[in-house]
């Protein structure tokens, strides 16, 4: 298959997932791999990917978990076209489908309360505190609009079955907002920091800039903070634990449900 000049062909999970994506603007890197690794899906379960982009997280999850089914919705039509190509490229047509849709008015086939798990990589940036990117695709992917994080949380909760899980990756400085939006609607929240370096290495330790958050819809169990994952060693290389997830398809274990 020929690749257009403005489209690159990349791989994730050590070549297990092939990905065509825009050469400019927002590009899938490690975040969708980490997100997919944290979803506790099993064979035969249905998963919704909210804001699916070019299908990176959906395909990583489907590659890791045999026989799970993943549907995704994405606002940008051009990304859905690429996602559909990526589904074919990875021979996942029987288990992965990405559709055009928005959170306020999802496609009719995305029925509320029908998914065992919902995953999302919401826009990271609050427009009140950040300047928008001049690139439209990157701006849409990275900058909140409309109902902001509340719209994303409302949609994810609505789509999950009672007792189903919501898994998100987000900036650590948005954690207060996420937790307040989940209050009394989902519990058993797990906060899993993504550390740039080993947090116990005094010479290199830095605060976690991103976290993975998992919650169970309808639960009232207390919130837990896990040890998280150190992404890099002192030399700037991926740690063995990060390599296992990013290149070898290992799951991120956030604790029992």
Label the model's feature ranges.
Residues 2-42:
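Class I SAM-dependent transferase core
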Residues 24, 146-199:
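Conserved Class I SAM-dependent methyltransferase catalytic core
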Residues 38-134:
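Conserved SAM/SAH cofactor-binding pocket of Class I
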Residues 47-50, 86, 115-117, 178, ...:
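Structured catalytic cores of enzymes that bind and process phosphorylated ligands/cofactors
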Residues 122-152, 158:
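Mobile active-site "lid"/loop adjacent to the S-adenosyl-L-methionine
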Residues 202-257:
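SAM/dcSAM-binding transferase cores
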Residues 35, 121, 152, 215:
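Residue-level signal for inorganic ion chemistry
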Residues 20, 97-99, 190-192:
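General small-molecule cofactor/ligand-binding pocket signal
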């Amino acid at each position: 298959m020929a690749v257009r000049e403005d489209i690159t062909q990349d791989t994730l999970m050590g070549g297990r997932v092939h990905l065509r994506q825009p050469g400019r603007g927002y590009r899938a890197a490690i975040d969708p791999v980490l997100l997919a690794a944290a979803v506790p899906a099993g064979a035969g379960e249905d998963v919704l990917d909210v804001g699916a982009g070019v299908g990176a997280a959906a395909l990583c999850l489907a590659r890791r978990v045999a026989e799970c089914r993943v549907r995704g919705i994405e606002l940008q039509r051009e990304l859905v076209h690429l996602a559909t190509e990526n589904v074919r490229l990875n021979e996942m047509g029987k288990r992965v489908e990405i559709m055009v849709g928005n959170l306020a008015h999802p496609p009719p086939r995305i029925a509320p309360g029908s998914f065992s798990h919902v995953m999302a990589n919401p826009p990271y940036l609050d427009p009140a505190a950040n300047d928008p990117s001049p690139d439209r695709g990157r701006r849409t992917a990275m900058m909140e609009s409309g109902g902001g994080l509340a719209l994303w949380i409302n949609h994810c909760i609505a789509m999950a079955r009672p007792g189903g899980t919501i898994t998100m990756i987000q900036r650590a400085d948005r954690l207060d907002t996420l937790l307040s939006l989940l209050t009394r609607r989902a519990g058993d929240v797990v906060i899993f920091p993504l550390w740039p370096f080993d947090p116990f290495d005094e010479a290199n330790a830095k605060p976690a800039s991103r976290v993975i958050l998992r919650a169970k819809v309808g639960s009232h169990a207390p919130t837990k903070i896990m040890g998280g994952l150190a992404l890099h060693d002192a030399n700037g290389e991926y740690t063995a634990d990060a390599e296992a997830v990013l290149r070898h398809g290992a799951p991120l274990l956030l604790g029992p449900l």
